[in-house]
């Protein structure tokens, strides 16, 4: 019955579109990338860009499927696999009547006369993000989105397997080449869609033109599994540049001043400078990113505006040290330290002789952030130039 209802619903949607003068070829769908990877430095707002698009186009939650790749991701966690499933079974007597708890059973009164239910374990096919999105796309004319976070942290060849062939789309937005579905997937899809559905015709899989796959990739991540060129060619790529953050209205559009300029967010680091003012987050980012670029000759390790979160436009001292400085020390300075640079020294307790800054120096004996040392480091950053390097 469910297969029939979904088929009827799809036909009704198609008829409505035709009455409106909208055909699949006219749809905005092909203007939206079918497969696109948003990439850039951490904190540039890659995931937010996707969310903005989905919100702006009123994509319903039932048409959005999410997953995150990691080193242990594989075909089973992305597509589906047989797994043990906990099920409930009623007990029946010889007459086919459910057996209930008796009054003299040593149970709370709430279960008195309730049917007895046994829990058993059975094996069944459990679909994951890809297959859930695939089924949904064949059940509706609406655009369906499969979102993959951190795609380069997993072994894409292992995760996609033979689905790799489906990523090659034709001019109509559908897979140029179909693949034979495994017996388990074929059985599952025939149960969900019906054996005559285009999504499993002749036991073959084919991506429809309303299924979009969008992914994010941090260029700073040290990928355990590099993405090969053949896989890359099947995606559109969108670079998200590091930029200042700007205010937006409820409609998602940028707010502008009287002169038509976008209004900056104006985040601050909740650490005082020598004049008693908080440090400007964007000014710090511009300077530290120029240092990182000098160290690494690359933008990959640089920080985006949304690398950490601000509360009431302030980045707390704890967040700044535990997230920003920890990242710099662990992922940048450790491998790309500047020899004899003034960036890593400070004068303690008014001493004339500078000493090296190590990460533990950012905390006092009680484990609280030492604001004065953090301020010294920020001052070093703001005053740094490549002439400091010998």
Regions found by a protein language model. Give the residues of each.
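C-terminal regulatory/interaction module of P-loop NTP-utilizing enzymes
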Residues: 1-390
């Amino acid at each position: 019955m469910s297969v029939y209802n979904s088929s009827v619903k799809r036909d009704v949607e198609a008829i409505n579109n035709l009455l409106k003068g909208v055909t699949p070829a006219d749809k905005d769908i092909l203007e939206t990338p079918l497969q696109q990877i948003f990439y850039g430095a951490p904190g540039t707002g890659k995931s937010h860009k996707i969310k903005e698009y989905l919100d702006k186009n009123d994509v319903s939650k039932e048409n959005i499927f999410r997953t995150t790749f990691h080193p242990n991701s594989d075909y089973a966690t992305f597509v589906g696999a047989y797994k043990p499933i906990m099920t409930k079974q009623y007990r029946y007597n010889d007459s086919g009547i459910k057996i209930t708890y008796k009054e003299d059973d040593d149970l709370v009164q709430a279960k008195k006369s309730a049917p007895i239910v046994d829990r058993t374990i059975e094996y069944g096919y459990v679909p994951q993000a890809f297959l859930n999105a695939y089924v949904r796309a064949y059940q509706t004319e609406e655009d369906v989105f499969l979102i993959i976070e951190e795609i380069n942290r997993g072994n894409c060849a292992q995760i996609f397997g033979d689905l790799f062939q489906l990523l090659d789309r034709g001019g109509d937005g559908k897979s140029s080449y179909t693949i034979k579905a495994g017996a388990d997937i074929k059985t599952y899809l025939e149960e969900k869609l019906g054996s005559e559905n285009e999504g499993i015709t002749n036991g073959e899989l084919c991506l429809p033109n309303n299924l979009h796959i969008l992914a994010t990739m941090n260029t700073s991540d040290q990928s355990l599994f590099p993405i090969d060129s053949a896989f890359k060619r099947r995606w559109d790529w969108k670079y998200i540049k590091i930029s200042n953050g700007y205010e937006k209205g409820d409609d998602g559009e940028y707010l502008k001043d009287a002169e038509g300029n976008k209004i900056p967010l104006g985040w601050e680091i909740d650490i005082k400078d020598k004049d008693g003012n908080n440090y400007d987050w964007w000014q710090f980012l511009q300077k530290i990113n120029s240092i990182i670029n000098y160290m690494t000759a690359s933008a990959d390790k640089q920080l985006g505006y949304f690398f950490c979160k601000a509360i009431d436009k302030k980045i707390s001292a704890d967040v700044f040290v535990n997230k920003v400085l920890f990242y710099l020390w662990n992922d940048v300075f450790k491998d790309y330290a500047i020899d004899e640079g003034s960036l890593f020294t400070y004068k303690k307790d008014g001493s004339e002789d500078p000493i090296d800054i190590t990460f533990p120096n950012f905390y006092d004996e009680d484990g609280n952030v030492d604001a004065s040392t953090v301020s010294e480091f920020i001052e070093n950053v703001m005053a740094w130039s490549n002439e400091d390097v010998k």
